[in-house]
Regions:
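A broad "ordered helical/assembly scaffold" signature
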Residues: 101-104, 113-129, 154, 160-162
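Short secondary-structure junctions and interdomain/linker hinges
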Residues: 87-96, 111-112, 136, 158, ...
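Short, charged cytosolic
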Residues: 124-150
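Transmembrane alpha-helical segments and their cytosolic interface motifs
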Residues: 143-173
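Extended, non-transmembrane interaction/recognition domains
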Residues: 1-116, 120
Length: 173
């Protein structure tokens, strides 16, 4: 719902499926699993993406629209991309988190490739999200106060109406 991976019907996997801890060095699958984890992380961070042959292509719609194309064979591991993916899809609203992450990434990747994202980008994403939450809490508290005031007014009017009705019954007896 937060991203569209065109090849998902062919590759029904998530980055988490390849995030496996391998306990010994020189395991031939380590590099392959890291590469797959990274490619899928990029795919699920993006607004839309697809794998065509040996290329991963995608679009990130944020503050600016950014298109990227990565050669699958030459891609280097970047653990920050998985951390961003994991942050988006763990807890909270993935749509809100994806929008914030894409805004920051689209601005940052004006100067570097998406595969070169670093910890500063992740920190910026989290900082922007915290500001977003702070604004939402403020809006929530304002709305809660308005609802409480509305309920208080309704209860008061209901009490006045009940008293008026009781007085009319007394006068009719």
């Amino acid at each position: 719902e937060a991203s569209y991976f065109y090849n998902f019907d062919t590759y029904e996997v998530l980055p988490d499926d390849f995030k496996i801890t391998i306990n010994y060095e020189s395991n031939p699958l380590t590099e392959l699993f890291q590469k797959i984890t990274m490619l899928l992380s990029i795919s699920f961070i993006a607004t839309s993406s697809s794998i065509n042959g040996r290329q991963l292509k995608g679009i990130i719609n944020g503050q600016r629209t950014m298109e990227y194309c990565c050669d699958i064979n030459n891609i280097q591991d970047n653990k920050v991309l998985y951390r961003i993916y994991n942050w988006i899809y763990t807890d909270g609203s993935p749509i809100d988190k994806a929008i914030i992450a894409r805004n920051v990434i689209s601005l940052h990747c004006k100067y570097v490739s998406i595969t070169e994202i670093d910890d500063k980008v992740m920190a910026s994403i989290q900082s922007n999200y915290n500001l977003y939450l702070k604004d939402n809490v403020k809006d929530y508290l304002e709305l809660k106060n308005k609802v409480a005031e509305f309920i208080s007014d309704i209860v008061s009017k209901t009490g006045e109406y009940a008293t008026s009705l009781l007085d009319k019954f007394k006068s009719n007896l």
